[in-house]
């Protein structure tokens, strides 16, 4: 399906950009455009722009054309996302006590957590920023805590500039916020920065349309201070027999199948 494939195509593109960045580090060609004869101010500006481009290449900002109807099964998760994000955003006057800004999607891999987040952004006609935790922690793309700060700053700018909802989806959340037996200074600072940013959007009285949706296959590995910041936790379960049958029907309806093929048997 072309609509769903767009998500994975963009993710492959982000990984290719990351590989290019790593190869540039190994070859010593990290700053190819800096003119050694330029003034220190010009060199710093060039380097800052280069780092900004590296950072933005790792992030998917274009919203995929994915609707709720494209997400088969997981009805409980869809209803929970509607109640947690969609309804409060559209009718905030009905939620005077506030609503969660941090949502954790957890469950087995390959069950549609990314697609659910993208469909939520489409339902709200908002922005969808997709980044994986391992990219944020990459030592080759600058200091991790600065990446976290830049990520939230960019998301807030989108929300404030056009007053549109922004879904900040962080995949592989455990690689960024998981429990550590030994931590180096950069990891500690990045995790503290993430805590600060989450507290900023979760504060009472905040009228922000920025939502952080984290996804993980290992929720037990997350540190408790971070887990508390995700006020809503939604389990994305394995598809049932009925859901698997609908999936086969959806993805084979454009194929020419042998008359003996039955979706129920495949499911």
Regions found by a protein language model. Name each.
Residues 58-266:
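Walker A/P-loop NTP-binding motif of AAA+ ATPase domains
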Residues 1-79:
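AAA+ P-loop ATPase mechanoenzymes
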